[in-house]
């Protein structure tokens, strides 16, 4: 695979554009000897839940155990408090969850249904009907079980039409095929939609507004557009107007919502490309597919059973994590930190939902806990002097620095050490590679950018939007999350990719992190301003331009849309040394961000909507 250099993003001018397993014992690894031969294991598909026991194979590890380190007391000035409430998902509640959909009888039934659906998918003779079935399977959340078959079908359709969608299709069929092909990395030209433009005016034909399914399909397809694809930009603007007009007319009828109306409202709220698979699957099963007259009972039963069985896997993982969290006593040692283990796990349902990735979800949840601790320490509790000391200690990776830290920071520092070393041990087993230096550098960079925001806050400095975003996409932790994901979903790892992740800030990581940062700002602004914080992107834009808050929010949404175009550029990019699987994780981080912060601060706040989302995706099965 060819390599290429990632240049700094050329989209910076848009910032100012007015338009649119920690254990209580602190065992710290200081060196790891590389094994002579690579152990045979599979990090990304390790689905057996572990209690952190290790195999009998041992590698030389030098450790330092510190009991009751000395503490230097730093003046305890009045500290800010976010007054985070206790978690609504208690340890006893999580441990009491019944694992309903486990066992041979469910597995046997699922396997039979899977074979039936596979025959159904392959046996469809009508080309459009086959595309519609693929779309339905995707929206039901079960396409991951038929990836090879779907790719084979789409590849055949692509090559049979000289690498273009079928020219004889109407708008609905053309948009559907375009979206599915783009989704799987096929280079489909946007010019196919010129067939639906008025050749005299160059605008989309007005009668498209009468074809709601066609307009809806074109709207969804437009969100697979890449930077500079003006036809798809025009399509999005045009179809948004069409769909909003239809929504207004439908709402005035005061009748029960039709399925088309539900689909239109759902799409206008957030397009398919930006939605997480599990949430979309639950909504589509319960609100759309069950109510369709042509619903296939086999397909519906399979989708429900798969959803519930995967949910049972999540419940097992969450039980393990809740025991880890309780045993760590971090909630007691760091009472100022958001105690949101279940919410940290909910992120993982958006990032990689498939049942075989249990290990990744467990470790990534612990990473989110670590990032939450560091975030709250910088944003809420730590003094500027303490935060500088913490960054220095992390940068030097020197235990002697701990004597300068207050006790609460020692706990945070030990957790960072232990978690980094646990990850390093697993990466060593999987890849025969010691990655501590890479992960450590990103953790130091993360804290430096957090420290910058703390300096802004204490000095009263108001950054420009460009200053804020250039610092904020690095302080939000996306690059740390995705470094972990790279090792989990890449084999073999390459030196070039690692150096790029560590130093080069690749475009896909940058823009996934920008979406994370900006979605966070949209959802948390009001709460963070109440407790006092550095100005967020919305306020920075208002200060830069004199815009109202509503105008600023629209501009931030526009920036998110522009970052999605940049990420779309990576789909099927043969010049990238990042795998399609890693690109998908980057995109899923963007999706999970928009899901968590869609209606407010879904990470910290525990309102009814946040509770319903946890219940729907992790706790309560879909009725069979």
UniProtKB/Swiss-Prot annotation:
Cofactor: Mg(2+); Mn(2+)
Keywords, ordered alphabetically: Chloroplast, Lyase, Magnesium, Metal-binding, Plastid, Transit peptide
UniProt-listed SUPFAM superfamilies: Terpenoid cyclases/Protein prenyltransferases (SSF48239), Terpenoid synthases (SSF48576)
Ranges for region Disordered: 27-54
Membrane spanning residue stretches: none
Binding site for Mg(2+) 1: 375, 379
Cellular component terms per the entry's GO annotation: chloroplast
EC number: 4.2.3.16, 4.2.3.121, 4.2.3.-
Residues the record lists as binding (2E)-geranyl diphosphate: 338, 375, 379, 517, 520
CDD domains the record matches: Terpene_cyclase_plant_C1
Cofactor note: Binds 3 Mg(2+) or Mn(2+) ions per subunit.
Positions with biased composition (Basic residues): 35-53
Subcellular location: Plastid, Chloroplast
Binding site for Mg(2+) 2: 375, 379
Positions contributing to Mg(2+) 3 binding: 520, 524, 528
Superkingdom classification of source: Eukaryota
Entry's Gene Ontology molecular function annotations: magnesium ion binding; terpene synthase activity
Swiss-Prot/TrEMBL catalytic activity: (2E)-geranyl diphosphate = (4S)-limonene + diphosphate; (2E)-geranyl diphosphate = (1R,5R)-alpha-pinene + diphosphate; (2E)-geranyl diphosphate = sabinene + diphosphate
Tissue-specificity statement: Expressed in glandular trichomes two to four weeks after flowering onset.
Residue span of motif DDXXD motif: 375-379
Record pathway: Secondary metabolite biosynthesis; terpenoid biosynthesis; Terpene metabolism; (4S)-limonene biosynthesis; (4S)-limonene from geranyl diphosphate: step 1/1
Family per similarity comment: Belongs to the terpene synthase family. Tpsb subfamily.
Domain remark from Swiss-Prot or TrEMBL: The Asp-Asp-Xaa-Xaa-Asp/Glu (DDXXD/E) motif is important for the catalytic activity, presumably through binding to Mg(2+).
PANTHER family in UniProt: OS04G0344100 PROTEIN-RELATED, TERPENE SYNTHASE 10
Its biological purpose: Involved in monoterpene (C10) olefins biosynthesis, constituants of cannabinoids and terpenoids-rich resins. Catalyzes mainly the conversion of (2E)-geranyl diphosphate to (-)-limonene, and also produces minor products such as (+)-alpha-pinene and sabinene.
Protein name stated in the entry: (-)-limonene synthase TPS1FN, chloroplastic
Record organism: Cannabis sativa
